[in-house]
UniProtKB/Swiss-Prot annotation:
The gene is Rcn1. This is Reticulocalbin-1. May regulate calcium-dependent activities in the endoplasmic reticulum lumen or post-ER compartment. It comes from Mus musculus. O-glycosylated. O-mannosylated by POMT1 and POMT2 and elongated by POMGNT1. GO terms for biological process: camera-type eye development; in utero embryonic development.
Amino acid sequence: MARGGRLGLALGLLLALVLALRAKPTVRKERVVRPDSELGERPPEDNQSFQYDHEAFLGKEDSKTFDQLSPDESKERLGKIVDRIDSDGDGLVTTEELKLWIKRVQKRYIYDNVAKVWKDYDRDKDEKISWEEYKQATYGYYLGNPAEFHDSSDHHTFKKMLPRDERRFKASDLDGDLTATREEFTAFLHPEEFEHMKEIVVLETLEDIDKNGDGFVDQDEYIADMFSHEDNGPEPDWVLSEREQFNDFRDLNKDGKLDKDEIRHWILPQDYDHAQAEARHLVYESDKNKDEMLTKEEILDNWNMFVGSQATNYGEDLTKNHDEL
């Protein structure tokens, strides 16, 4: 492979790593939370749905660890987790108890993710990450060797991402010292989890989808973000449904395009609680006697759904010792 080819491959891998470490909005299913109307409507054998539940109950990063366990081992360890979820020890898991557990799992995943990458950026080991440290760790080679990027497609990507990262870093830096504490760096990597970062999430989403640069998202841009029309055939039914969603529910003022407020309403709905929705879904699917609470037996009878949900951090909690949970 020629030197230029190797460089392009290396830069591509570097960029993929940079983007993987960040929490910016990307594809369709990362932008849109699942509406309540979908809960309880999917068939039990839907493996994709099970994966969603597993990620909710266990944690996305570690769901693959569930594959290490036999069904009997999974049920045994899941039973121990159920005892932790049942905070009042009455033998019944309520939707509220399940919701609080899922929120705990979500929060732990986020902070574990930050801990994994912290040392890569905290070069001077002072328990803070300055903007300069982050910039050098992420873009140092690009900044030091601009000529190598001049004619590559990566040049435009890095040139765009650097100021965007700086803008997000400054938004997360509440005291304005251009140095991030762990909490501030968590807000930088996971802005969707912090109220003061919501405007950045909206702005970055707009920039990602608004291809003609007019400051709005029209219907074609909205569809292009989730569907690549590579041939001249008819659009799938789900795309036609999304066009209807755009017209009926996304475009609130009916001007044919989405402004920032409409984008915010779309990707960050104020009346939607993900953990509450997932907890309701798990109860709905497992509550055999329809008393709106779950016994340990009901959960273990539907173990395959739970070990694939955020409540067990996608299986990670099943491989941990009891004291770690």
